[in-house]
Amino acid sequence: MGAKQSGPAANGRTRAYSGSDLPSGTGSGGGGADGARAARFAAPVSGAQQPSASAGAAAAAAAAASAPAAPRSRSLGGAVGSASGGRAAQSAFSIPSAGGGGGPYGSQDSVHSSPEDSVGARDRDRPAGGGPGGPRLVIGSLPAHLSPHLFGGFKCPVCSKFVPSDEMDLHLVMCLTKPRITYNEDVLSKDTGECAICLEELQQGDTIARLPCLCIYHKGCIDEWFEVNRSCPEHPSD
């Protein structure tokens, strides 16, 4: 058999899949056109990229400027936190003022106040009544003859007078050394009231005793009275 001849279909397929079949002139001309087209489109593309490049530079500058601001903000935050912590500690350890003065440690008046001022303030705040905080009654504020029982006085066994304790010795000496009252014995000539000692009627014919103060009693009653007392029953101060 003879050599196989290539048909037009085979040649067309070969040209379709092989780029070397293109003429060199056509290929060089196409390459030049493609290069010119690429250069024409490259310029607008590079010009369009210029704004993005400037924007990137601005972003980089902003990032560089903001980089030191973060530590500064942190340092400022720490300073603010330390200041607030100091104020909180000061308020926690502050001494309250008794008078409610302005400031954590009270006013200067409360610091420099004297003990006399404190006593005067307590006296002003004390109620005027006689309660626990009011003025108390002092024994010496009343005369002895108005309130002798406050002094722990006693009743004299001689004259039956209530005597203050500080005058007890002098009064006993005077009463014991005082001479007995003398009386005039008499017989009652008529009925005259009642005896102040026995509270019985003084009748005509009764033996009576007439004292210097002109008081009359039954003789027996006044004798018993003088055994204990040295004064008239109706005039103990004489």
Swiss-Prot record:
GO terms for biological process: positive regulation of autophagosome-lysosome fusion; protein ubiquitination. Pathway: Protein modification; protein ubiquitination. Expressed primarily in the nervous system. Expression is more intense in the granular cell layer of hippocampus, Purkinje cell layer of the cerebellum and the granular cell layer of the olfactory bulb. Detected in sensory neurons but not expressed in sympatic or enteric neurons. Expressed in testis, adipose tissue, columnar epithelial cells of the gut. Residues 35-77 have a biased composition (Low complexity). Keywords: Cell membrane, Cell projection, Cytoplasm, Endosome, Lipoprotein, Lysosome, Membrane, Metal-binding, Myristate, Phosphoprotein, Synapse, Transferase, Ubl conjugation pathway, Zinc, Zinc-finger. A zinc finger (RING-type) spans 195-236. GO terms for cellular component: cell projection; cytoplasm; cytoplasmic vesicle membrane; endosome membrane; fibrillar center; lysosomal membrane; nucleoplasm; plasma membrane. A lipid is attached at residue 2 (N-myristoyl glycine). SMART domains: RING. The keyword Acyltransferase does not apply. The RING-type zinc finger domain is required for E3 ligase activity. This is E3 ubiquitin-protein ligase ZNRF2.
